[in-house]
Amino acid sequence: MQQIIVIEPIVTDRLILKALVKEDASAILHILSDRDTAWWSDDFKMRSLDEAIDFIDWGNEAIDVIHYGLFRKESEKAIGYIQIKLPKCSGIKDARELGYALSKNFRKQGYMSEAVNAICDHLFRDESINRITLEILNNNLPSLGVARKCRFSYVDEPIEKKHKRFLDDQPVDLYVRRRPDTDMSLAA
């Protein structure tokens, strides 16, 4: 029996993070069809409204992933999204991996850092989640900035242990944010 996961809205100072709906497909298509945005993603470059609708449906099924749409409080148009990989996708029960994309019209305004911090706080309400991870290409300066602002720590791994990006086999760097009340002396 499939577990039903409710995508609860999360409200920050400037944003509402909530489930995407089919009416958001054109905004998601605009974001993920942008060549510069798609390059950083391990996903594909979106080409059609039907692909955007499939993407939204996939995130709402909450089997492998959950998608939170990012909306400014004063607008009904999605400006980005955050993807949360669930254990069925990642194979890891005590961690969640995040991925995200933001419309280029809203970059360098702190929206993604605000959203990632809110998602982390929300996820850590579940006591079974001990860490949240990001996998970032080492030349993705905007994502590296989000990781730093959101208190993620770089994990130094040998090159042979690094995950490879599906798209082109480039190694990605791992960043981790641990549950605030985790005692690191017990983790050794």
Across the structure, where does each feature detected by a protein language model lie?
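Acyl-donor (CoA/ACP) binding surface of acyl/acetyltransferases
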Residues: 1-35, 67, 71-188
